[in-house]
């Protein structure tokens, strides 16, 4: 199964407790890692971060905004996130798309 996790406002692989990184980031990171044991998982964020691929887990940063930006100020980037997401990935190739 191909699974897409959308983590628009913060990278779930950044340091916990930094800016918006907290419980939801831990949840997305852990569930993505566990799901990748048996499935292909792609996690995408708008926050600037380093992208990586580790076996069945791929993390993609669309590098739209800095991590120190307040969550309320990130809303203006939603359309750009959507556009870059559609340009970067074939969304029809995913069986499940989950956004938190």
PLM regions: where:
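N-terminal subdomain of nucleotide-sugar transferases
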Residues: 1-51
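A short alpha-helix capping/helix-coil boundary motif
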Residues: 9-12, 65-66, 87-90
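Short, surface-exposed alpha-helical recognition segments that flank or form part
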Residues: 19, 23, 72-80, 96
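Surface-exposed alpha-helical segments enriched in charged/polar residues
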Residues: 33, 83-90
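A generic structural signal for alpha->beta connector loops
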Residues: 38-40, 56, 93
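A short, charged, and often flexible helix/loop element on the N-terminal side
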Residues: 57-86
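Short N-terminal targeting/anchoring amphipathic segment
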Residues: 89-100
């Amino acid at each position: 199964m191909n699974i897409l996790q959308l983590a628009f406002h913060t990278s779930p692989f950044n340091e916990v407790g930094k800016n918006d990184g907290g419980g939801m980031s831990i949840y997305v990171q852990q569930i993505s890692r566990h799901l990748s044991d048996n499935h292909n998982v792609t996690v995408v964020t708008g926050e600037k971060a380093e992208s990586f691929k580790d076996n069945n887990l791929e993390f993609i940063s669309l590098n739209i905004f800095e991590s120190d930006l307040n969550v309320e100020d990130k809303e203006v980037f939603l359309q750009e996130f959507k556009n870059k997401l559609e340009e970067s990935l074939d969304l029809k190739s995913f069986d499940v798309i989950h956004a938190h």
